Amino acid sequence: MQASADSTRMECLWSNWKCQAIDLLYWRDIKQTGIVFGSVLLMLFSLIQFSVVSVMAYLALAALSATISFRIYKSVLQAVQKTDEGHPFKSYLDMEISLSQEQIQKYTDCLQVYTNSIAKELRRLFLVQDLVDSLKFAVLMWLLTYVGALFNGLTLLIMAVVSMFSLPVVYDKYQAQIDQYLGLVRTNMNTIMTKIQAKIPGTKQKE
């Protein structure tokens, strides 16, 4: 019964985090999104200048400086006012953050499903189960060689973060026009791939 309650609570938390992520990406709260966006970019730009270990150490020191200073401030304030409010972070210290065995098993099963799905798809592409799909994958890998030559992984990550916080807003504002152009591109690509597939011996057109 307890495991079921924990699972329900975890699902509610996951749903809540999902809604919060959507609100962040769509800039529903400009101040909150700005803080998160700026913090992530600052951390990524810091990684350009410093190693991961240094950045993590600096972040830990900054967090400790804030919490220790606040703890000392509250202790002095309680001593001056002669009050006993207890530990300032007591509510966070008492918060349950452990995962039950059922929750761990659930997330492990989800990870296993995704891993198996990716492995099967890669096997299908590399062993040329469908020639056209394998050719598409080869073209994608060929394009990525040029992308990798122009940008390093960290630069691509920064571009991905900027896109995550900008593209949803742009799409939400110009959804009709973007859907129209994407439909045209998809139609043209399907037409081209159908012509190519028709000229390749031994391939069958997908229904």
From Swiss-Prot:
Inhibits amyloid precursor protein processing, probably by blocking BACE1 activity. The keyword Transmembrane helix applies. Pfam families: Reticulon. Expressed in the animal hemisphere (presumptive neural ectoderm) of blastula and gastrula stage embryos, and along the anterior neural border, in the panplacodal primordium, and in the dorsolateral side of archenteron roof of late neurula embryos. At the tailbud stage, expression localizes to the central nervous system, including the spinal cord, prosencephalon, mesencephalon and rhombencephalon, as well as the lateral line placode, otic vesicle and pronephros. GO terms for biological process: brain development; endoplasmic reticulum tubular network formation; neuron differentiation. The gene is rtn1-a. PANTHER family: RETICULON-1, RETICULON-LIKE PROTEIN. The chain crosses the membrane at residues 35-55, 139-159. This sequence corresponds to isoform C of rtn1-B. InterPro entries: Reticulon, RTN1-4. It is found in: Endoplasmic reticulum membrane; Nucleus. The lineage of its organism: Eukaryota, Metazoa, Chordata, Craniata, Vertebrata. One of its GO terms (cellular component) is endoplasmic reticulum membrane. This is Reticulon-1-A. It is a multi-pass membrane protein. Residues 21-207 form the Reticulon domain. Keywords: Endoplasmic reticulum, Membrane, Nucleus, Transmembrane, Transmembrane helix.
